Regions:
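Catalytic-site microenvironment of enzymes
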Residues: 11-28, 45, 49-51, 55, ...
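Aromatic/hydrophobic beta-strand junction motif of beta-rich domains
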Residues: 30-37
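Extracellular acidic loop/turn motifs
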Residues: 39-43
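Bacterial N-terminal signal peptides
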Residues: 1-10
Length: 386
């Protein structure tokens, strides 16, 4: 049954995103999600274009937008609604070139390494292997010193940050030859290296303590689904199923929350440390940025922030992908997440599905699928321990 325990919206027609008066970044299009009554068989029209309606009444549309105030008109038979939202103006050229990172250079010839300072606040972007963006490898404040070298025949500077190489335009940096820099490329130390790297092998599940963390909670709703349901609620429902599956497998399990409370971000990994947990698993569901089509970017993945967590994430993600064959598997990925950076406890964060997609909303609240995902997580932990 669809959405057991969660009532359908009472309104005959609703829009969950974008919200009334909401401000969007400088985009050329946005997704619109909402729901119509399942008893209304009339065509659904969004800004003049007929839009498919999922069997639950949920719908997704992509509409073009322009800078300034935009008006959204949604009609379904005799029902209609109007929504206004604001799109930001695109950035205008500044006094120096904007940061345009690249990720590789074929056979670059580097000049003599020297020190460079950042001209202003700078984000060193990391390319993600999943269809979304917004992640950063490093945040560099003004006057931050990096080791760099000019790339001959190009207008780029190769820089070394924490053992990784990147390329920046010279307008982002100021050369400072007098500042001493390391002569070798020394990676930033991994705090997790101070702890045992192997999982608890040779012990029964009853000796392994696992902390399950339902993401968000309280006033922190997380993402929204077409019916306007909150990610925090489906995270809790899925986390409870994972807790039950882990206990059935014999593990000792605690949860960071079992209600609509909000444990602070850093209190969650701290609880894992204080309670001497062996594993930390944070449960989330995804959504994409406004100008992406959720149907095109839908995927499942598991994140970790260090090598200890990555092995755990890979084992769990392999099992989750097997029970979700219709969703793109983006594998286990590394990402600097506050809840996963605890070096003392192998930690990972699940992004099970994209709830801003009508069919994914239905699947994510389905108790039977939640049970399959939960059993996959439990089996993944067992695989990791072998």
């Amino acid at each position: 049954m669809f959405a057991v325990g969660i009532p359908l919206v009472s309104a005959a027609l609703s829009v969950a995103f974008p919200g009334e008066g909401q401000s969007l970044p400088a985009v050329e299009r946005t997704y619109v999600i909402g729901a119509a009554s399942v008893s209304n068989s009339a065509p659904l029209v969004v800004n003049g274009a007929t839009t498919d309606v999922w069997r639950t009444g949920a719908f997704l549309a992509m509409v073009p937008v322009k800078p300034g105030t935009n008006t959204l008109n949604v009609m379904c038979g005799k029902e209609s609604l109007e929504r206004r939202f604001v799109v930001a103006e695109p950035p205008k050229p500044g006094s120096w070139k904007p940061f345009k990172p690249i990720t590789s250079a074929k056979d670059p010839r580097l000049g003599k390494p020297s020190a460079w300072r950042t001209r202003g606040t700078l984000f060193a972007n990391r390319v993600r292997p999943v269809p979304d963006d917004g992640d950063t490898l490093h945040y560099l404040p003004p006057q931050f010193t990096v080791r760099g070298a000019e790339v001959e025949g190009t207008d780029w500077i190769a820089v070394w940050i924490g053992g990784k190489i990147g390329f920046l335009p010279p307008a982002s940096l100021v050369k400072t030859p007098a500042v001493p820099v390391p002569s070798a490329n020394k990676p930033a130390p991994d705090p997790a290296a101070c702890f045992p790297s192997a999982p608890p092998r040779g012990v029964p599940p009853s000796a392994v303590r696992i902390l399950v963390d339902p993401g968000h909670g309280g006033s922190d709703t997380g993402a929204l689904s077409p019916h306007g349901w909150c990610e925090k609620d489906v995270n809790l429902s899925q986390a409870r199923a994972i807790r039950d599956a882990l206990r059935k497998a014999g593990f000792q399990v605690l949860m960071t929350r079992d209600d609509d409370s909000f444990p602070t971000l850093y209190s969650r990994p701290k609880l894992a440390y204080d309670e001497h947990m062996d594993v930390f698993i944070s449960v989330h569901h995804n959504a994409c940025r406004a100008d992406r089509n959720p149907r095109e970017v839908r995927h499942t993945t598991t994140y970790a922030s260090n090598e200890r967590g990555l092995a755990l994430a890979a084992a769990i993600q392999k099992r989750i992908a097997a029970v979700l064959p219709d969703i793109k598997n983006s594998g286990a990925q590394t990402k600097s997440l506050a809840v996963c950076r605890n070096p003392a406890v192998p930690s990972c964060l699940l992004e099970v599905d994209f709830i801003n997609l009508p069919e994914a909303e239905e699947a994510s609240w389905d108790p039977e699928r939640q049970k399959k995902v939960a059993e996959a997580v439990a089996q993944g932990v067992l695989d990791w321990m072998k």
